[in-house]
Amino acid sequence: MTATNNIITSFSDEERPSVLTFDQIKEMKAQGITFESHTVSHPDLAQSDSSRQESELANSKQVLDKKLNQTTTTIVYPAGRYSDVTMELAKNNGYKMGLTTNNGLASLDDGLYSLNRLRILPTTTAENLLAEMQTNP
């Protein structure tokens, strides 16, 4: 089984307590964990001007692509906040999809840049997850 972690790149660069460093991220990546973008500094993208959004999306992707030798494909919007401008900028910066915090199963009907998801918490059991999947078609 694999997992994906979403990285706020400036936090990892600063080596904040309880935040993965890039050395730790590389070690985990070598074991099969994947890493995607959660911006540079975790702003409210819906309230940010287009220049700030562009910087957050582009710079985070560039850092992850370079440091992890990968093509970062997914932007995970901080606090699930985004706008039509955000989605367009994500696409223009080479992201293939965007994840929201809207609870539910992802559907192409929602568009690739506004995908729902089920939140998995440390307390989520297999039974909880199955029940959530059955109630959120």
Task: Provide a role label for each language-model segment.
Residues 26, 30, 46-137:
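C-terminal active-site subregion of NodB/CE4 polysaccharide deacetylases
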